[in-house]
Amino acid sequence: MHQVISATTNPAKIQAILQAFEEIFGEGSCHITPVAVESGVPEQPFGSEETRAGARNRVGNARRLHPQADFWVAIEAGIDDDATFSWVVIDNGVQRGEARSATLPLPAVILDRVRQGEALGPVMSQYTGIDEIGRKEGAIGVFTAGKLTRSSVYYQAVILALSPFHNAVYR
């Protein structure tokens, strides 16, 4: 059984990690241990590089806390141009997989507040009245009328980031 350290305690992210690992390695093939670690970037990262740096930092910090694991996984959400997205970073001590998620264009009324220094999650909670929306369906669920959720979009990115770990051509 793979010991997987999730560098987050966010339920939407943990669900995506678990589903993706079980899709690739088989149901019941992994045990997820969530840990809260620092990203080393602002609460609301801007741009692809800052967001990816946050995910990489979280993986490194999780690895230092739990060096005995088989995999360390981080999902860092950010804002790039007029959209929200995330970076997924997965490390197994030998190689790393990284993938960027799909992007969701955000309306100006939301972006204006985020650009003024507020984080997307709290802005969306105020807009929708849903407490801790970032730990649930997120802006993605709201603006896709529930057709997608944070977790479903993250799931795809985790699957992509896992590609180097089960395809020999990457080695």
Swiss-Prot record:
Give the matching Gene3D superfamilies: 3.90.950.10
Gene Ontology annotations of biological process type: nucleotide metabolic process; thiamine metabolic process
Q: Give the cofactor note.
A: Binds 1 divalent metal cation per subunit; can use either Mg(2+) or Mn(2+).
What cofactors are annotated for this protein?
Mg(2+); Mn(2+)
**Reaction catalyzed:** XTP + H2O = XDP + phosphate + H(+); ITP + H2O = IDP + phosphate + H(+)
Gene Ontology MF terms: ITPase activity; metal ion binding; nucleotide binding; ribonucleoside triphosphate phosphatase activity
InterPro entries per record: ITPase-like_fam, Non_canon_purine_NTPase, NTPase/PRRC1, YjjX_NTPase
- A Pfam family annotated for this UniProt entry: NTPase_I-T
The alphabetized UniProt keywords are: Hydrolase, Magnesium, Manganese, Metal-binding, Nucleotide metabolism, Nucleotide-binding
Residue sites binding Mg(2+) per the record:
38, 68
List residues binding substrate.
8-13
Q: What is its EC number?
A: 3.6.1.73
Q: Which domain of life is it from?
A: Bacteria
Look at the named UniProt entry and state the broad enzyme category this protein falls under.
hydrolase
Family, according to the entry, reads as follows:
Belongs to the YjjX NTPase family.
How it assembles, according to the record, is: Homodimer.
Q: What does this protein do?
A: Phosphatase that hydrolyzes non-canonical purine nucleotides such as XTP and ITP to their respective diphosphate derivatives. Probably excludes non-canonical purines from DNA/RNA precursor pool, thus preventing their incorporation into DNA/RNA and avoiding chromosomal lesions.
Its protein name is: Inosine/xanthosine triphosphatase
